[in-house]
Structure formats: structure tokens, C-alpha cells
Amino acid sequence: MIPDVSQALAWLEKHPQALKGIQRGLERETLRVNADGTQATTGHPEALGSALTHKWITTDFAEALLEFITPVDGDIEHMLTFMRDLHRYTARNMGDERMWPLSMPCYIAEGQDIELAQYGTSNTGRFKTLYREGLKNRYGALMQTISGVHYNFSLPMAFWQAKCCDISGTDAKEKISAGYFRVIRNYYRFGWVIPYLFGASPAICSSFLQGKPTSLPFEKTECGMYYLPYATSLRLSDLGYTNKSQSNLGITFNDLYEYVAGLKQAIKTPSEEYAKIGIEKDGKRLQINSNVLQIENELYAPIRPKRVTRSGESPSDALLRGGIEYIEVRSLDINPFSPIGVDEQQVRFLDLFMVWCALADAPEMSSSELACTRVNWNRVILEGRKPGLTLGIGCETAQFPLPQVGKDLFRDLKRVAQTLDSINGGKAYQKVCDELVACFDNPDLTFSARILRSMIDTGIGGTGKAFAEAYRNLLREEPLEILREEDFVAEREASERRQQEMETADTEPFAVWLEKHA
């Protein structure tokens, strides 16, 4: 089932320097909660400055949903320590609140008024909050409080230069983008390995179902927790953050211009369903517009092609201007076993898997095959640890045992690991392969199995509160390592100044400004 990568691996072993200079970055979301696990109702902590303009700490959907962002980094240890510093400083500056250590929220009901993230009075800030109002009215606020980790990854120019392209040539943008689309297609075909190993949301609190019927065969504990015994990541299931209305958009990942055209089409396509919500009610705006996507960011995807945008530029226009610059992997649940929600083993695994995806052959993929890849993902998400589970290739009928496919993949990853270790020194990547491959013979080693054991004992709430308390105490005690207290104070002041400048510079009324941007 795994493509034959032997020639590409042999090429890599002859050109190990092509992997020198991999760059990556991390984003981690987490809900601020009170000691009893309920969602915090306070505003964004003052010490963290402006959520609109802060370089490292912002908010996602809700005012209580923190998001930590590391700068682009070539050093894994440095990146993780930077992320830990962001958590340490925040833990010391959020009073008695703590960070929820799980992807799925618990003590939270749909009817509860979840305050949307607030970004001040500038037109840009108000637009961001209005976008969130639209998300709430379209999908419900509860779904939007699910949190995850995003891993951003780029291969060095030396890789593309050696592999395919004269990077000074006029078609370099297209060729490098084609290389990243190959990564994306392979990710759709084989990325289910990520929830298999690292999915950590096998259960949900009963409030999450909101009394709606579900066809999933949930088992229920006395404390009202619903779980599937072999599930890995309910966050990635239809219960979690997915968007059914987008499934027939027909966006494909074969070509830069085709992809951008599909995205631009979706933000112009009217939706009957969202038109029913209305645009305004009693003088209050309910969504930016009633199209299938209000803006491009609303496209739900487990992986995204990205380029850093310039001021006022849309993500797709940035891609058209310069091609794909990096890939954003969006399928990681919060790692409950790490105080910062992600660890070195996961980052090293993703490095290996992304390199493998760049090497493995990836035939073009129609929108119907893209839909077929969802079958494998759903199997792994809902019953990934089930004995005898099989997976298929695209829309073909042949089936292969998951443990065998996993071990075949790791045979290739081990060779990538040897190459990466040869240029970095040590055996860190090979060690990760040896640790993780064991999960295919023994699913009890996976994150989902480990966290489910705890949840069955103490419930999601009990598990979440215990980890949150332990991590709060740990992070508050640890000294900063890379950033200093004064760096945070300076960034707080600078972010507040930047927000102030944006608000002062806006002369156009929001309603007029919005007509141009909606």
C-alpha cells in the first residue's frame, strides 16, 4: 500500500545536505479555565498586551482561547523552549486561571454565552470579531472552542535545488509549489498515521452532543462521559471541527493556479443554508456575508499550503505572488502529556513524515479520490486501535491491515531518520522511529489509549483538571530560558501601541469599510 520510495531514499542518502536547514514553527491553542474547569469569563490577560498585534500570544475564536505562536526556527530544542517560555510567562500572569490541557473542552454548554475574541475598535479588529460571529452562527460556538496544535514546516532551498529546480529560474515558484502539493497529496493519503499515534481525544463530555442524536456507538460512563473504545481523535471527526458544507467545493491539490481558483470561487459562492441566518438582525451584523466561506481562512483542512501575507493581502493572493512557502499541518490534538501541548518526539516524527511525503510519488488526485481518502481517516479517527482494522488506497477496494501499513511506512522513515541524524549528529530521529513503531504492534502505547485509561478512571473533567493544576504549578515555578521578563513587557507595550496606531489611522466608518471587504 505504501508507494515504493527506494529510489528517492537512495537519492536522499547521496544528498544528505539537501535536508540541512529545515525550518519549522508551532502554534498551540488552549482555553483559559477556572480551578473547577469552567471556562474563564475574564478578558484577555492584561500582561499579554494586544491580542490583535502581539507577535507571540493572541486569541483564536473566543476571548478565553489563547494561542501561542513561535517564530520560525531551525532548531527544535530552541523552538520548544521558546514555546515553553510563552507558557511560563502566561501561567504567572493569569491569576488563578489555568490552561486546559485537552483538545476537547468540558465544563461548557452550548447555550452558555461564549464571549468572542475582542480586538479593539479598528476596522481590522472589528472584522476579526465579526468573522467569529459568523462562525458561531454557522457552526455553533462550542465546536469553535476545540483546540489543537499547528506545525508549520518548510524544506530548505537546497532541497529543491538538488531535487528538481533551478531556484533562480522563472518557473521556480511553480516547481517548488508542485513539490509542496505532492507533500499535501501524500498527507491526505497517509496522514491518518498522525491521529493513530498522537490523537488524544477519544472521548467527549455529554454537553458536547447537546442532546442531538448520533449514529456513533458511544459507550457512556457514570459521570456522563461518552467514548468510543478504539477512537483516537474525535476532534477530527464530524463531531469536532469539520465542515460538511465544504465537502463538495471540489478544491484540489494538484496545481497552484487550480487550487487558488477553487478557493477564490468558494468565497464568492452563495450558500442557501447560510443565507437563512441573515446578514443583520436588530442592527447587529451576524456574518461577513452568506457565501460558502466568509473568508479564505474558513476553509477547513487538515493541512494547508501557506505563504506569509503582506499587509492587506489574502492568503490566496500571497500564494499567487510567490508560490507555496511552507506547509501548515493541522491534525495534531493537544498532547495532554506535555505542559506545552506538544513535545520533541512529535516534532521529529513530523519532520520525518513531511520529508517522506516530499519524496514519495504522489499521483494527481481528483476531488472524488480526495473524498475517498476521508474513509481511511474516519476509520482511524473512530476506531484506529481496533484489532484487525484495515485501510484502503483511495477509492480502490483492496484492503491492508493498519499495523502492517504503519510498519512499512516506518521502514522508510527509519532511513530518512538515519540521513537527518547523519547531518545533525546523534541518533535522535532514529530513537523516535524505534519508540513509535512499537505502537503498531501495541496500540496501548498510543496517546489515545493512554489518555482514555485516565478518563475512564476520573472522567474528562477530572483528568483535565489534574493535568491543568500540575502544569500550572510546574510552569509558574520554572525560570524563563530564552525570553526575559523585560522582553514580554516590551512586546506588551509595543503591541498596545500598534493597536492604538491602527485605531487612530482608521478614518472610514466600519460599515463603509466592510462593504469593500465583504
UniProtKB/Swiss-Prot annotation:
Spans through the membrane: none
InterPro entries per record: Gln_synth/guanido_kin_cat_dom (IPR014746), Glu_cys_ligase (IPR007370), Glut_cys_ligase (IPR006334)
Biological-process GO terms, alphabetical: glutathione biosynthetic process
Pathways involved: Sulfur metabolism; glutathione biosynthesis; glutathione from L-cysteine and L-glutamate: step 1/2
Catalytic reaction equation(s): L-cysteine + L-glutamate + ATP = gamma-L-glutamyl-L-cysteine + ADP + phosphate + H(+)
Molecular function GO labels: ATP binding; glutamate-cysteine ligase activity; metal ion binding
Keywords: ATP-binding, Glutathione biosynthesis, Ligase, Nucleotide-binding
EC id: 6.3.2.2
A GO cellular component annotation in the UniProt record: cytosol
Family, as annotated: Belongs to the glutamate--cysteine ligase type 1 family. Type 1 subfamily.
The name this protein goes by in its record: Glutamate--cysteine ligase
Organism of origin: Shigella boydii serotype 4 (strain Sb227)
